């Protein structure tokens, strides 16, 4: 994988445990995160650490191979699916998507017990090597679309 790839999918949910909705394009802002997703809004007095979640298509495929399953990526409940680029395994890195969106990584997106409800063994399959993805906060607003370039800036 390289330092540049593409945005392969966008998903959001309007409430906890809500159904994931995939979209082709979306506005992502510092104030609200992914438009239409319940997790992105900044709460007064809080530092937003989990506005956006990203997962690599290659990591999802590896988890599916380990599990022997074929589950759609959005069942991971991540907002953005990237392909052809390795997401940073550290906090403070900047991911650029499209012309304007910038996301600062805030940590690993550890798989939760909800993954076991989707498929037995899924949590364990997502645990190694940051397969569950990364979390981030928006530092520069932007409208993004499936197919946009994804770059690691720092």
Where in this protein do the model-derived segments appear?
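Metal-cofactor-dependent catalytic cores
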Residues: 1-154
């Amino acid at each position: 994988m390289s330092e540049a790839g593409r945005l392969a999918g966008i998903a959001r949910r309007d409430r906890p445990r809500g159904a994931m909705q995939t979209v082709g394009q979306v506005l992502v802002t510092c104030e609200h995160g992914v438009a239409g997703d319940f997790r992105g809004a900044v709460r007064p007095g809080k530092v937003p650490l989990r506005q956006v979640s990203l997962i690599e298509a290659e990591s999802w495929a590896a988890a599916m191979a380990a599990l022997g399953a074929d589950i759609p990526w959005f069942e991971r409940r991540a907002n953005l699916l990237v392909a052809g680029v390795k997401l940073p395994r550290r906090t403070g890195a900047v991911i650029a998507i499209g012309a304007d969106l910038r996301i600062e990584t805030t940590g690993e997106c550890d798989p939760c017990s909800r993954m076991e409800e989707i498929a037995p063994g899924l949590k364990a399959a997502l645990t190694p090597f940051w397969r569950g993805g990364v979390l981030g906060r928006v530092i520069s607003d932007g409208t993004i679309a499936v197919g946009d370039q994804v770059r690691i800036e720092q």
